[in-house]
Structure formats: C-alpha cells, structure tokens
Amino acid sequence: MHRGKGMKFVGDSRIPAEKKPNIPKDYSEYPGKTEAFWPNFLLKEWMVGAVFLIGFLVLTIVHQPPLERMADPTDTGYIPLPDWYFLFLYQLLKYEYAAGSFTVVGAMIMPGLAFGALLLAPFLDRGTERRPWKRPVAVGMMLLAISAAVFLTWQSVATHDWAKAEEQGKITKEADIDTNAEGYKVFKEQGCISCHGDNLQGGAAGPSLVDSGLKPDEIKKIAVEGKGKMPAGVFKGNDKQLEELAKFISETTAK
C-alpha cells in the first residue's frame, strides 16, 4: 500500500487543555458547613487567643508573684514546696511505699508507668468511635489519671502547713550584725541561731528578730519563759548573759 492510500483524515485527535482561572470557592453554597480558613476561621482563633492573652497579662499586673526570701542552701529547716501542678507527685512521695528505700518506685517507676500508658493509649484504642461510652479503654485511663491527680493534689493542699510555709519564706529586712558583740556570742552559744538564723533573719522554726520592737525586759522574759512554739527553759545562761542577749536583740535594726 502506498503512503496515504486508503487513509481518511477525520479530525484532530488531540485533547485541548482547558485552563480555568483560580477562583475561590463560593462558601455561600454551603451555609454553616464550611468556611474559608483565611480569614474566617483563623480570625476567630486569633480573637480567642487575644482574650486569653489579655486576661493573663491583667492577672500578672493585678496579682504580685508570691516571692520568697533569697534561697539559702545552708538552711536545713526550710521545707521546699513544688508548684501546684506537681503537688500530686509531691504527695505521692510522702507515702511509705514511695519514699525512703522505695523512692525509686515513687519517683521513677510509677510516673514511668503513667506516661507509658499515655503513650500507648492511641495503640490500645484504635477505634473510630468518638462517643465516650464506646471508648472504654481510653476514657477509663483518662478518668483514672485525672482522679488520682486531683485526689493527691487535694491531699497535699489539705495536709500542708501553709502558715509555716509563709513564715519560712517571708522576706525579712537585712541588718548589720556585729558578730563580735557579746550579745551575738551569747546568741550563738545558747543555740538561738538554729531557729532564728545566723543573721537573726528567722526561718521555719522561729521568727525574725530584726526590728522586733521588743524591750530588753520583754526579750528576757521570752528567753526564760518561752512564747508560742518556743518552749520555756531554752536559755541556759546566767543573768549577765541574758542581759547582753536582750540588749543585743533590742538594738538590732534594719539598714
């Protein structure tokens, strides 16, 4: 057959590329079902975030932070307390089975099991259901964790001595202490330093003696008879030492 013989041209078989302009979808066709991410959805997110941010800034301005005195690593009477979101773990470490020789159990094993269960939760419950009563494993683990954290936090708050914690962290005035004074030597020899601090700044066991506002006779009476948590008979010195101690404390004032 010669070239072209017996063939008939019927038209162009190529498919033309139809170019359409990139027109955004008209969301009015689906009222209440969908919307544009920008700016409709994102603007709502920003507005909610702005409300929380402004509220947080107002709280930081209105309420002063609960600052305590400068940390002193030599103060063995200070009882530290974690922030509220760690109170449940703080309370857990108080129990016999999670403290002492079992500290590893309370500090490592139990939290490790809890976080391990949290990581395994997506693999333990792979269902497509969204109703809580049809997801017993995930919902049960969540309720158990929340209940335990709430109970331990409540126990920690209820059993903690907040008045003592406030007293031990109170910011006290500084004073120039003459460590060569006879009154300070008596103060140190009689063991007053263990409760009231080496600079008379006070602590968890005793109040600050700086700017006490007490007269020497009042100080002598307290040293002999005691007051509040201070028992009687703590002072073991003679009358001269008592006089020096009372004079020293009454004259100790802040800068």
UniProtKB/Swiss-Prot annotation:
InterPro entries assigned to the protein according to its UniProt record, in alphabetical order: Cyt_b/b6_C, Cyt_b/b6_C_sf, Cyt_c-like_dom, Cyt_c-like_dom_sf, Cytb/b6-like_sf, Cytochrome_c550/c551-like, MenaQ_cyt_c_Rdtase_cyt_b/c-su
Cofactor dependency: heme c
Main location: membrane
GO CC, one annotated term: plasma membrane
Keywords: Cell membrane, Electron transport, Heme, Iron, Membrane, Metal-binding, Transmembrane, Transmembrane helix, Transport
Binding site for heme c: 192, 195-196
Top-level taxonomic group: Bacteria
Cell compartments where the protein resides: Cell membrane
Its membrane topology: Multi-pass membrane protein
All residue ranges annotated as the Cytochrome c domain in the record: 178-253
Keyword Transcription: no
Transmembrane annotation, as ranges: 46-62, 104-124, 137-157
Subunit structure: The main subunits of the menaquinol:cytochrome c complex are a Rieske-type iron-sulfur protein (QcrA), a cytochrome b (QcrB) and a cytochrome c (QcrC).
Described function: Component of the menaquinol:cytochrome c reductase complex.
Protein name, UniProt field: Menaquinol:cytochrome c reductase cytochrome c subunit
Organism: Bacillus subtilis (strain 168)
